[in-house]
Amino acid sequence: ALNEADGSNKSAISKYIETTYGELPDETVLGSHLNKMKESGELAFKQNNYMKADPNAPPKRGRGRPPKPKVPLPPGTVVSPPRPRGRPPKDPNAPPKSPKAKATPATGRPRGRPKKVARSPAVPSPTAVSTGRPRGRPPKVKPQLTEVSVES
């Protein structure tokens, strides 16, 4: 199917697979496999046709920025192995750590919000105002009506 000069489309490839190998599982499976082969460079895609990629063509560049070229080390340099990943394991033979003593704060105050101090009931709060005025906003003063006589 792919040996034609101008390539083969998806339907021709599926017909070829059905005649050669029998039943196809699904059209989408074939499409996804063709896309994978196209992305990896095994197949070339041109005008809705898939064709075998040229074996002499240079490999496709990967996505993103290429890595920096490594500078060769001078001869005689010993390269240490890279550090292992993750947290190092605990030493089972190490003595147990002593518990830390709690450090008292420098100010001498306890942490958090202070406790509510209860007031002694000996000093009653004044309930009535000594001036005799009622609480709140004073009422609006209404002007007094005067009788006006109309003489004719």
Curated annotation (Swiss-Prot):
GO cellular component: nucleolus; nucleosome; nucleus
Single GO term (MF): double-stranded DNA binding
Recorded superkingdom: Eukaryota
Organism of origin: Glycine max (Soybean)
Presence of the UniProt keyword Glycosyltransferase in the record: no
Major subcellular site: nucleus
H15 domain boundaries: 1-54
UniProt-recorded name of the protein: HMG-Y-related protein B
DNA-binding region: 60-68, 82-90, 108-116, 132-140
Annotated stretches, region: Disordered: 40-152
UniProt-listed GO biological process terms: chromosome condensation; negative regulation of DNA recombination; nucleosome assembly; regulation of DNA-templated transcription
UniProt-listed SMART domains: AT_hook (SM00384), H15 (SM00526)
Similarity field: Belongs to the HMGA family.
Signal sequence residues: none
InterPro entries: AT_hook_DNA-bd_motif, Histone_H1/H5_H15, HMGA, WH-like_DNA-bd_sf, WH_DNA-bd_sf
Cellular location(s): Nucleus
Entry keyword annotation includes Transmembrane helix: no
Keywords in alphabetical order: DNA-binding, Nucleus, Repeat
